[in-house]
Regions:
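Small-residue-biased structural context
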Residues: 1-144
Length: 144
């Protein structure tokens, strides 16, 4: 805790984002467990929580990465191309995730087999994406 007082802003941001990743993964597992046990009410509740958590995480990530791109010093220049690649590569996945969560978070939208198949596919893609972020982009952010 004392060490956190002296951590760089980027390290604090990365730490927060990694905690949010844990929350997202935990919520995804809760949704799968609830749906698998035929508790669609709980699955919907957890899906709404996931929607809120994911939207907040993505918006904050976009804002902070945008701020980094606006800085024009040597340290930030080193990661500029990595940030641009990250944003370009994740753009389609992010749009699909937001559409999916928005659609299935609606009270009137039932959680059916199509939902479960798509959700499992998205969870796999997001798992890979989170792993990539944490092991590439986030490590570089912490270093500057």
């Amino acid at each position: 805790m004392f060490f956190d007082l002296f951590s760089s802003k980027n390290k604090k941001i990365v730490k927060r984002w990694m905690k949010e990743h844990e929350e997202i993964v935990t919520l995804a597992h809760k949704i799968i467990a609830a749906y698998s046990s035929n508790n669609h009410i709980l699955a919907k509740k957890e899906l709404i929580s996931l929607n809120n958590t994911a939207v907040n995480h993505l918006m904050n990530e976009d804002i902070e990465l945008y701020k980094l791109l606006k800085k024009r010093n040597d340290m930030h220049h080193k990661i500029e191309s990595d940030i641009k690649k990250f944003k370009e590569n994740f753009s389609e996945t992010k749009i699909n995730l937001m559409k999916f969560l928005t659609y299935y978070s609606k009270a009137e939208t039932p959680l059916d087999e199509s939902f479960f198949d798509q959700f499992n596919s998205l969870v796999g893609i997001l798992g890979e994406r989170i792993d990539f972020e944490e092991n590439n982009l986030y490590q570089k952010l912490e270093a500057i």
